[in-house]
């Protein structure tokens, strides 16, 4: 019976365990399309982006765990007490995270959370990161990671410099072996 429960029983809730942030220095970053004169900006820009994406990821994981605790198994399709307030809190905190780092923080802002969280792939050692910079005020960071069963998904972040700070101008997603990029929310 224990073997049956191990495979088909209730899954343990591991969404509460604390994750540590991945350092940009620990990631595999390809810079082959970046001229040498911009290489000194790689660590600054990639570290900025990865740090902010992980902040968003931790928020999503926290809200998801709290949402699961509100669920009532007897009424799985009903809005539970506290759920509306949780969504409001998520939206406010999400906006608070994005406002200082994005040119248009409300454009296509996230309206969902889940498990795994959107940027969990950053802690996967197989994730590839490409740093592309051809002008001093604009950089592109692309990530490639396995999603699901063998599907390789890509994210593309375009960052621009405003005064002395880098900000995310846009985010797109795509799939391996495709040249098309689709607009996406940060």
Predicted regions and their residues:
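Short acidic, low-complexity intrinsically disordered linear motifs used
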Residues: 1-11
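Secondary-structure junction/capping motif
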Residues: 2, 40-44, 176-184
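Generic detector of low-complexity/intrinsically disordered segments
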Residues: 5-6, 21, 51
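N-terminal intrinsically disordered, low-complexity tails
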Residues: 10-27
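Core segments of small alpha/beta cavity-forming domains
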Residues: 24-110
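Surface-exposed, charged secondary-structure patches
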Residues: 83-149
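Low-complexity, intrinsically disordered terminal/linker segments enriched in charged
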Residues: 132-156, 162, 170-186
């Amino acid at each position: 019976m224990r073997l049956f429960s191990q495979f088909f029983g209730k899954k343990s809730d591991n969404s509460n365990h604390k994750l540590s942030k991945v350092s940009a220095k620990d990631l595999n970053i390809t810079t082959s399309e970046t001229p040498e004169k911009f290489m000194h900006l790689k660590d600054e820009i990639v570290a900025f982006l990865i740090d902010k994406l992980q902040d968003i990821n931790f928020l999503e994981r926290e809200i998801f765990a709290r949402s699961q605790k509100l669920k009532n198994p007897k009424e799985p399709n009903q809005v539970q007490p506290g759920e509306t307030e949780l969504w409001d809190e998520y939206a406010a905190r999400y906006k608070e995270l994005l406002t200082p780092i994005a040119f248009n923080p409300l454009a296509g802002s996230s309206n969902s959370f889940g498990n795994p969280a959107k940027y969990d792939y950053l802690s996967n050692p197989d994730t590839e990161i490409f740093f592309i910079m051809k002008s001093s005020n604009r950089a592109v960071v692309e990530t490639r990671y396995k999603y699901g069963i063998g599907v390789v998904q890509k994210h593309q972040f375009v960052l621009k410099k405003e005064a002395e700070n880098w900000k995310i101008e846009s985010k797109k997603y795509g799939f391996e072996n495709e040249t098309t990029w689709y607009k996406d929310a940060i």
